[in-house]
UniProtKB/Swiss-Prot annotation:
InterPro entries tied to this protein: PdxA (IPR037510), PdxA_fam (IPR005255)
Pfam families the record matches: PdxA (PF04166)
Subcellular location: Cytoplasm
Highest taxon listed in the record's lineage: Bacteria
Major localization listed first in the record, in broad terms: cytoplasm
Other noteworthy facts: The active site is located at the dimer interface.
Name of the protein in question: 4-hydroxythreonine-4-phosphate dehydrogenase
Cofactor note: Binds 1 divalent metal cation per subunit. Can use ions such as Zn(2+), Mg(2+) or Co(2+).
Family, similarity comment: Belongs to the PdxA family.
Keyword NAD tagged: yes
The organism of origin for this protein: Shewanella frigidimarina (strain NCIMB 400)
Record function comment: Catalyzes the NAD(P)-dependent oxidation of 4-(phosphooxy)-L-threonine (HTP) into 2-amino-3-oxo-4-(phosphooxy)butyric acid which spontaneously decarboxylates to form 3-amino-2-oxopropyl phosphate (AHAP).
EC class name: oxidoreductase
Signal peptide coordinates: none
Length: 327
């Protein structure tokens, strides 16, 4: 059965619309429902010199594979005309509304996944709309207490124990309860959405050399190791904690389905050095599939035709893959 994937281009003055139009230049085995202002897409396509036809979204009809040069449109209306590369807080509510719609329709199973383009958090907050990011927005909308951020690149998947918090707060944020919660979500999602029977999770230590038997920090001894042992007793296949400076090498990565890093800059620099532009942000713990690009708005490239749609293509391919596997 053909899947139906929602796409939100994100910030209208950014490269988001450009990338969606570039995606449309090839055929896809799914229906791509773009939540956007149709005039924005047609104007940007003309600017890029690329062919584009929009067909209206008809939820009562079965989804059809997307033919090259076409997109299915769920129409929204911008408050003001867009100038490429120029942020306008008047259009912030439009951006948030496209996200709200995509989330609602995924929760009602009208869509099989959502792929999100880059947004500009600053301009949304400047408009008086509290917004800390896609992940938090969708989690709040779906009433999810916790979600897990995971980035995937060819040959490596890295999930994060903590995300966007100062390094000084990381150690206190790593508790037995939180380790239980995050790893349980990670394990469950790898089974249900990735189709893995018994996922192997490799876990980084927090301290250099994973604490070196307590000489370089006791978090491993007092918190991480006891929590991992308790999770192993539940049948989870967990390796670690291992020193982060040695974990990211082929002899471990070839065995791992995912690496759990303790903090943002412990795991993501390695992943992005291996696959920047080819990595995908995946939110685990939502009641639906959400993938995203691994880059920002690149306002200076909007409308120029120079934006690379590699990450958006990877995000869409990953969403299609997960939608086909999801139980």
């Amino acid at each position: 059965m053909t899947k139906r994937i929602a796409i939100t281009p994100g910030e209208p003055a950014s490269i988001g619309p450009d990338l969606v139009i570039k995606l449309a230049q090839q055929a896809w085995p799914v229906e791509l429902v773009v939540c956007a202002d149709p005039n924005l897409l047609m104007t940007r396509a003309k600017m890029l010199g690329l062919p584009l036809q929009l067909r209206p979204y008809q939820p009562s009809q079965p989804p059809k594979p997307q033919t090259a040069g076409t997109l299915t449109i769920a129409p929204f209306t911008l408050a003001e005309e867009v100038e490429c590369g120029v942020l306008n807080e008047a259009n912030s509510a439009y951006v948030v509304e496209t996200l709200r719609y995509a989330g609602e329709k995924n929760m009602s199973n009208e869509f099989d996944a959502v792929v999100t383009g880059p947004v500009h958090k600053g301009i949304i907050n400047q408009a008086g709309i509290p917004f800390s990011g896609h992940t938090e927005f969708f989690a709040l909308q779906a009433n999810c207490a916790d979600v897990v951020m995971m980035l995937a690149a060819p040959g490596l998947q890295v999930a994060l124990m903590t995300t966007h918090i100062p390094l000084a707060y990381v150690a206190k944020a790593i508790t037995r309860d939180r380790l239980h919660h995050i790893i349980t979500i990670l394990h469950r999602e790898l089974v249900s959405k990735f189709g893995l029977g018994s996922p192997k999770i490799y876990v980084c230590g927090l301290n250099p050399h994973a604490g070196e038997d307590g000489h370089l920090g006791r978090e491993e001894i007092d918190t991480i190791i006891p929590a991992l042992n308790e999770l192993r007793e539940q049948g989870m296949d967990i390796v670690g904690p291992l020193p982060a400076d040695t974990l990211f090498q082929p002899k471990y990565l070839e065995q791992a389905d995912v690496v759990l890093a303790m903090y943002h800059d412990q795991g993501l620099p390695v992943l992005k050095s291996l696959g920047f532009g080819k990595s995908v942000n995946i939110t685990l713990g939502l009641p639906y599939i959400r993938t995203s690009v691994d880059h920002g708005t690149a306002l200076e490239l909007a409308g120029s035709g120079k934006a690379d749609c590699g990450s958006f293509t990877c995000a869409l391919n990953k969403a299609i893959e997960l939608a086909s596997k999801s139980k």
